[in-house]
Amino acid sequence: TRQGRKSMPLRKIEGSLGKNETIYDYGAGRGVDYIHLLATGHKATACDPNTELGKCKVHKSDVVISNYVLNTVPPGIRDKIMKDIASSTKNRAYLTVRRTGDRGTPRYDGYITSRNTFQKYFTPDELKNYTKHYFGNCKINKSVTNGDSSSVICKDPKCFKCHSSN
């Protein structure tokens, strides 16, 4: 988020978040959205894999929010994060990623940008198809999806303790 402002995805979905629902902000960064959720009376928890040194745990919550996380990690890590998100979700997950940006040097299924960071850009359909491996029901979140971002709402998380990890 820019300079202490809540993220665009949170601004778009905030009205659909119930005060009695537990919310897990997975990939919270500096915690701006998390702090806003707490300040507005929501029951929220947050974790960021970068600041927690990969120690984000499954945290069962009614709603999981993950904004601009999946597009910043390579495939193997992305799969682990998606399993954590699915395992943490009781009701629904809101997932938003970058759709466009700096296309530097090809690496894995994305790019190393001019800032030396990894980015995987997803079209709305690519994100929907990818997340369906982890949830039984995903649809494009048209209120958040725009020229820069792709977003989905997912329900019916699949059980990953039932599957072997690759």
Language-model-detected regions and their locations in the chain:
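Hydrophobic adenine-recognition pocket in adenosine-nucleotide-binding enzymes
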Residues: 69
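A conserved beta-strand element that flanks and buttresses the S-adenosyl-L-methionine
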Residues: 65
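Short glycine-rich, flexible loops that bind phosphorylated cofactors or substrates
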Residues: 72-73, 102
